[in-house]
Amino acid sequence: MVGHLVKYGKHRTRRSYASIKEVLDVPNLIEIQTASYQWFLNDGIKEMFGDIMPIDDFQGTLSLEYVDYQLMEPKYNIDEAREHDANYSAPLHVTLRLTNHETGEIKSQDVFFGDFPLMTEQGTFIINGAERVIVSQLVRSPGIYYNQTTDKNGRPHFGTTVIPNRGAWLEYETDAKGIANVRIDRTRKLLMTELVRALGFGSDSDIIDIFSDQYDALNMTLEKDVHKDMSDSRVEEALKDVYERLRPGEPKTADSSRALLVARFFDPKRYDLASVGRYKINKKLSLKTRLLNQTLAETLADPDSGEIIAEKGTLVDKEVISKLTPYLDREDFKTTTYTPSGDAVLEEPVTLQKIKIESPENPEKTLLLIGNGHIDEDDRTVRPADILAGMNYFLNLQEGVGHVDDIDHLGNRRIRSVGELLQNQFRIGLTRMERVVRERMSIQDANTVTPQQLINIRPVVAAVKEFFGSSQLSQFMDQTNPLGEMNHKRRLSALGPGGLTRDRAGVEVRDVHYTHYGRIDPIETPEGPNIGLINSLATYGRINKYGFVETPYRRVDWTTHKVTDKIDYLTADEEDNYIVAQANSPLNEDGSFVHNTVMARFGEENIETPIDRIDYMDVSPKQVVSVGTAAIPFLENDDSNRALMGANMQRQAVPLLDPHSPLVGTGIEYKAAHDSGVAMIARASGEVEYVDGRQIRVRREDGQLDTYELMKFRRSNGGKNYNQKPIVHVGEHIEADEVLADGPSMEQGELALGQNPLIAFMTWQGYNFEDAIVLNERLVREDVYTSIHIEEYDSEARDTKLGPEEMTREIPNTGEDQLKDLDADGIIRVGAEVHDGDILVGKVTPKGVTELSAEERLLHAIFGEKAREVRDTSLRVPHGGGGVVQNVRIYTPENGDELAPGVNMMVRVYIAQKRKIQVGDKMAGRHGNKGTVSVVVPEEDMPYMPDGTPIDILLSPMGVPSRMNIGQVLELHLGFAAKKLGIHVASPVFDGASDDEIEMALREAGLPQDGKSVVYDGRTGEAFDKRVGVGVMHYMKLAHMVDDKIHARSIGPYSLVTQQPLGGKAQFGGQRFGEMEVWALEAYGAAYTLQEILTYKSDDVAGRVKVYESIIKGEPIPRPGVPESFRVLVKELQALGLDMQVLDGAGDEVELRQMDEDDSILPVDALEKLARTNPDLLNKDDEEVAAAFSKVEEQSQTFEEK
């Protein structure tokens, strides 16, 4: 036997073909959600109140400070919140302290700050009773970015952007003449030197003193920057110029300009780099990284001892940098302090760190490297030192020193997870509240006011509510199956507020970048307009405190060159400095490399390199891909496009009645199911005392009893059936974190999205043409692919102007047969079988004494009775919604339920449908091999194997070669061997079974080595000419079921303006006969067909009613009238002032129907209802029917005369 046995959980053992030793377990897969929210509760709230408070009033007498906060007990628990359509949230109480500086009085008070949504253990929120997920957002990181463009003459232009987390952008750029300009917040250009002068370095000599005179761009800019107004100092003139750019047309003074610049860049409330922005700027401008590979133009010595560290002319390599690093970190090494003039924006001195280097393009020329000194990590605004050092980097870039940034590099894109997104929203609410507090401080009496009276929590509550309810990133959770659920929580979206938009995103942003390796899955992304903008976190990826994605690597010892088990998590820009060997590099037992050279990655290059240069090694072959992709066996043999479809379609698999985990898995099935949140996990170890379908009781080792309530037939967000089944038995000892009960799409603790049928690749009567699938009837009969779907329907009884609506069994014009399953209140009983159009909740609405509609006139004409003054507004089963009533919930204010204003009672009915697989359903394997069922063949007619076993599914062999997803064929063969041997196997991605191993498994199972078999025709018993590939493959039924899509319209709603039928299943619409279809009929000269399609069947309002009448009366169909859309066109032209008339063949004007003539035409639905409510009418002879109609016509005539 090749391979080794691995236990997954307690109940499943697989033969694993993995050859690479895993040194690191897959981390908790939904930690991205839970850890981020935990950070928000622990630190995020404090940080935010710290930013906003203390709030001082305008006079400075009152000051409101934040002390502490606490979350109270939630009002509803998770299940109650679901049931009551409420939020799972806890009241937030904040302790505030109000200080009166005049009297010295201090008041502390606990202020209620609204209900705050809590995250469930599964990483979701329950908002209005529905589970929602906050998707993490991928955005540009704050920091300083350099770019280069080439103009049409081939000259390079450089640009710099300083991007804060919030606040004004600062941009430097060179123009066509090579002069350096600055833009503040996307306004008009300003010379770069003017900004330096505004910072307090007024004279040309000051500027040259800082930057040196070796830069052409700077010298040209200084030439252009002349002193215009001699009455102002250079600093004041520069300040006024800046002000004019920012506020054009306003009177400019140096003071207002100073205040404006301070507010724009140096006020922490207006400008915030966030800790990540400060980190990125310090990293970009620090001399440690910038000195690498440059040649020194001065000798560097120890400031204390005078000992020489590096001689002039030394090329700075990694070794020299490691010697220099401790000195560069010192406050007194090569630093110069400049003091700005007294009339500058900021008066504090500026400390810069400067080192001279040779220009790479001209060694005679000496350039300066200016670092931003030692700015504290906690300083969240941009400092003058940043601005000057940033300008120096910009000038050096034009001399060939430094490098431009790649905006799509994951070192420059960061993740905003739940915690941060929530914090940003909360901060917006607090900022709005701050304004209110300031106003109230100045209005109210300072001696009597309390914190409670100052605070208005409305803006805060509104901001949080809006975020959870309607933000683009707060999404209704995909609950088709556990994999879809987990994938949704690990999704990374570049869309949303502060992100990209679909139309503006180019190809570069969407493309796979080399830094995605181990961080973002290159495969799993939607097809369509969002491709590449929505991604999935890789299996081992995690997010660090700055929001950058890190991936783990095994450290390689630099002296022994052996791979250790020490794990380092690296961000994308750290990884750029190292050479990383691939996970499949062969190792000896002691961790040394087998070969002297290995394939490795360095930056974006794949290189073959000697082992003494290797710094790190991949942790696992599956670290490249996400969990969904890692569940595809033989992924390495599939084309990437098909792998993408396979990964996406696994999320759409419907939970089946009795699912089976794949015979050929990848070994991640257990972890995926365990972390998805649908399995029941043991909280502590102990012994099982009691098990049934509803609960499991476990006696802990310390004697406590844990009770686990199982989820039973709950409707998921996607209308699927979520159900849990115990997999432990009484007396069994269990460990903490073990799976006690399977959720939907699980078996024995593993993910089980489909079944393992016997599949053959062969054609059958052309029925599997173009990806169609031929099924064995056994799959229908034995409920192999049967799923349960639950739909919910609501009916509300409201107060109307004419009186309250009433839930009742007394419904006008309904027979007893329709009421047989309703109780006294008109509510359906649980367990009743209902069909389309059946009443679920009987409800009547009072009718005002209005003029009779044509419908009622018709009823009067036939029955001559006064109709009751109520209308039937019962809740009925919609088309395709029939099934068994599974549950009924009644909500009334008397029971303490919170209902919307004006609602007296609400009834919610759940209908369960059992759907067997049928023609038209979509099915798929895990390799993007999808198809629709075209025919279900009796078992005895299906082709069968030599031992008499009929094949379950026939797939077309044409679907394999052109699509290059060969993984399905390998899975088929290995699955056949596994089935015969009665084992489960694991073939992990990029480390799975080889061809030889599959052949050995087939031989072990006593099967032919090529995996093919003779197959006999079930109808004739003859063998087919050629041997056929037969085997076992994991095959799923997808959520695209024909029941949800099939649709037919007889009579339905019409659009108000054009009077044409609406479109779409949801509106019970018709089929659009478009322009091209009209051409087709015209081409065949089918004039009458075309005419009726354009008139009676569409928008000839009078005509379609007359057709209905003539059909009922059995008369010939009258000639069509003028279509409504034509009338609309005429009216539009008349509205434009064109005199438009319609003439007939004789030249007489055709009268078009007037707007107010609608009443005189009987609505078709009135007639339909008449026929429905009085079926006996249709059985009477024509004369009686005709009489009824003529009576109606008379009535409408008299009505018109009135």
Swiss-Prot record:
Any Pfam family: RNA_pol_Rpb2_6
UniProt cross-references to InterPro entries, sorted A to Z: DNA-dir_RNA_pol_bsu_ext_1_sf, DNA-dir_RNA_pol_bsu_external_1, DNA-dir_RNA_pol_su2, DNA-dir_RNAP_su2_dom, DNA-dir_RNAP_su2_hyb_sf, RNA_pol_bsu_bac, RNA_pol_bsu_CS, RNA_pol_bsu_protrusion
Entry EC number(s): 2.7.7.6
GO MF annotations, alphabetized: DNA binding; DNA-directed RNA polymerase activity; ribonucleoside binding
Keywords in alphabetical order: DNA-directed RNA polymerase, Nucleotidyltransferase, Transcription, Transferase
A GO cellular-component term linked to this record: DNA-directed RNA polymerase complex
Chain segments annotated as coiled-coil in the UniProt record: none
Cited function: DNA-dependent RNA polymerase catalyzes the transcription of DNA into RNA using the four ribonucleoside triphosphates as substrates.
Stated name of the protein: DNA-directed RNA polymerase subunit beta
Gene of this entry: rpoB
